[in-house]
A protein has these predicted regions:
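Conserved class I S-adenosyl-L-methionine
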Residues: 191-201
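A short, conserved alpha-helix within the catalytic core of class I
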Residues: 291-304
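A short beta-strand submotif of the Rossmann-like class I SAM-dependent methyltransferase core
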Residues: 285-288
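N-terminal accessory regions of S-adenosyl-L-methionine
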Residues: 2-169, 365
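Conserved alpha-helix/loop element of class I SAM-dependent methyltransferases that forms part
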Residues: 173-192
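Conserved SAM-binding loop of SAM-dependent methyltransferases across substrates and taxa
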Residues: 202-213
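A short acidic, Gly/Pro-enriched loop at the edge of an enzyme's catalytic core
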Residues: 274-283
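Class I (Rossmann-like) S-adenosyl-L-methionine-dependent methyltransferase catalytic domain
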Residues: 4-36, 40, 155-167, 171, ...
Length: 370
């Protein structure tokens, strides 16, 4: 039966819009999520969505329809950067190397803390990872910024956390600051004015960066429900900033004007086609492009060459994109060193390091020549 189901899924892969019709009127689907989702399904961006994210979105919306956003941190977040299972030893290489000569103490009450809606096994895995990441971050200059991150948002959606040195710690907090550490090593962020992040997810990185670099204007580009989650989060994080949901604008001039008049703006992927040449100082793609088909990656690279001056990318060194098989194609394999990402000739690689965790991921910086 499993073989038959797999074959059927290759011919007729799951599509999120069919599931959405069943849950659209659920009590926990609020008007903002309903608006964003319907706009997404009717947009060109829906056609860019990989089979993998059709499957994940069905899972994400099932959680949202049952619990709403209030339990995001213990449900949907598991499809982003909340690790409750460690599948490969090599994920730990960098973090262990960082800490092998730096002993630290673990509070057993925190290590064995049972997190809401997690099993004990999941909780212990998550809690121990918090310790490893916290003490890795402590060895960097970016550690000084940890107090700038707001518990109202990093802990405000039923997020799992432990307390270390009287500070509430989540993996999202630490990973976001470790992302900033790499970005700052690749580029002088203080010199930039406008940043765009594609695949911005929950908005965790955006919130961390804007909590440190308060002068920046920020564009978040993603699909539903990520835009809904990050929009809800960032309105809570930055109540004094002008935050604009621009997902239905199809006029180039109007879009640029509204982006310019916003501190934080939200767009769908296809709207990137309307951005002016060299209008973005830095584009970020953190933990997202390795989930795409090769043709979609090249679609984005072509757009980046037009509108951005610098590009930061974090990806798995090697991966097979889940659910990418179809009747005509085997696995969609992506291997950076083998050239599967086909970096444009006018991009100069200026930065390359391994991610602290998972350490079989690469962080890469590119200067885009005009």
């Amino acid at each position: 039966m499993n073989i038959i189901n797999k074959f059927i899924n290759r011919i007729l892969p799951k599509r999120f819009d069919k599931y959405w019709k069943k849950i659209e009127d659920s009590q926990n689907i609020d008007s903002t999520l309903r608006y964003i989702t319907n706009s997404f399904i009717n947009s060109k961006s829906y056609k860019l969505t990989s089979n993998y994210w059709h499957v994940l979105n069905i899972s994400n919306y099932k959680s949202l329809s049952e619990f709403g956003i209030k339990k995001y941190g213990s449900t949907v977040a598991k499809n982003y950067y909340t690790f409750t299972e460690i599948y490969h030893d090599e994920w730990f290489d960098e973090v262990i190397n960082n800490l092998k000569d730096s002993p630290f103490k673990i509070d057993s009450a925190e290590a064995f803390k049972k997190q809401a809606d997690f099993s004990l096994k999941e909780s212990i895995t998550y809690n121990y990872l918090c310790y490893l990441l916290f003490y890795s971050l402590k060895k960097t200059n970016t550690f000084q910024h940890i107090s700038k991150l707001n518990d109202k948002t990093y802990l405000g959606f039923n997020d799992p956390y432990i307390k270390i040195n009287d500070t509430n710690i989540t993996t999202d907090k630490i990973i976001s600051l470790l992302d900033y550490e790499k970005i700052q090593k690749a580029f002088e962020v203080k010199k930039f004015k406008r940043v765009l992040e594609i695949g911005a997810g929950s908005g965790r990185t955006c919130e961390a960066i804007l909590s440190i670099e308060k002068h920046l204007k920020y564009i978040l580009c993603d699909i539903a429900p990520a835009i809904y989650i990050s929009y809800s989060r960032l309105k809570l994080a930055f109540p004094d900033k002008t935050i604009s949901l621009l997902i239905d604008i199809d006029n180039k001039i109007e879009l640029e004007e509204k982006i310019e008049n916003s501190d934080i703006a939200f767009v769908f992927p296809h709207q990137l086609e309307m951005l002016n040449e060299n209008s973005v100082d830095l584009t970020l793609a953190i933990d997202c492009m390795h989930e795409m088909d090769k043709s979609t990656i090249q679609y984005y690279f072509k757009l980046f060459s037009h509108f951005t001056k610098n590009f930061y990318l974090s990806i798995w060194e090697k991966t097979d994109v889940p659910y990418s098989k179809n009747i005509l194609r085997k696995k969609n394999k992506l291997d950076y060193e083998s050239g599967d990402y086909v970096i444009p000739e006018n991009w100069k690689n200026i930065f390359k390091e391994k991610i602290v965790f998972p350490s079989n991921m690469l962080s890469l910086g590119f200067k885009i020549k005009e």
